[in-house]
């Protein structure tokens, strides 16, 4: 976590949809081998239209927003509101590939992104049930910002 001025010009957003779990939107900046987490919206228990209203005060609509493709109706609502929301295609082993990509980057988090900081500090790995060894799959608990981060880097990861 550090306060560091972002000097790049490549931006994407990542969104993990939620209601009981957090709905998270992250604004990401990309520069050389660094990923900047610049802004977050982290809310629970809100309808999509309520989240859109909050997001309109925080994020630019012209930045592509990579979203969980499992929720096409929500993506459509964001598009109708003027956001450039697009579903991320989920491929076999994509979570592992996204995490490998992230591990090769320096991630700089704006101190205002308190929920993202909390999640990344508490991120842990699953254990194999038989051997007890850690495996390369994160524990799916309190990982909403991490999912938004993974969605937000997916396009850049593939180029």
Q: Model regions: which residues?
A:
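Charged alpha-helix within mobile-element recombinases
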Residues: 136-152
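Acidic two-metal-ion nuclease catalytic site recognized across multiple nuclease folds
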Residues: 154-159
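Residue-level detector of short, conserved catalytic/binding motifs and their immediate flanks
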Residues: 23, 63, 146
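ATPase catalytic-site recognition across NTP-hydrolyzing enzymes
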Residues: 1-15
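Short acidic, Gly/Ser-rich segments with clustered Asp/Glu that frequently serve as metal-coordination loops
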Residues: 13-23
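Mg2+-dependent endonuclease catalytic cores in nucleic-acid-processing enzymes, primarily RNase H-like
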Residues: 26, 31-140
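Generic detector of well-ordered alpha-helical packing
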Residues: 17, 69, 144-145
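Short hydrophobic/aromatic beta-strand or adjacent loop that forms the aromatic wall/cage
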Residues: 22-25, 150
């Amino acid at each position: 976590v550090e306060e560091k001025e972002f000097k790049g010009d490549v931006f994407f957003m990542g969104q993990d949809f939620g209601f009981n779990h957090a709905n998270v939107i992250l604004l990401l900046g990309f520069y050389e081998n660094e990923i900047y987490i610049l802004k977050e919206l982290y809310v629970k228990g809100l309808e999509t239209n309520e989240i859109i209203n909050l997001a309109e005060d925080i994020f630019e609509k012209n930045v592509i927003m990579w979203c969980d493709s499992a929720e096409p109706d929500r993506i459509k609502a964001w598009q109708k509101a003027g956001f450039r929301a697009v579903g991320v295609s989920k491929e076999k082993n994509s979570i592992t590939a996204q995490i490998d990509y992230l591990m090769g980057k320096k991630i700089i988090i704006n101190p205002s992104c308190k929920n993202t900081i909390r999640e990344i500090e508490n991120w842990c790995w699953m254990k194999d049930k038989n051997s007890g060894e850690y495996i390369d799959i994160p524990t799916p608990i309190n990982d909403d910002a991490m999912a938004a981060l993974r969605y937000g880097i997916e396009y850049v990861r593939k180029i």
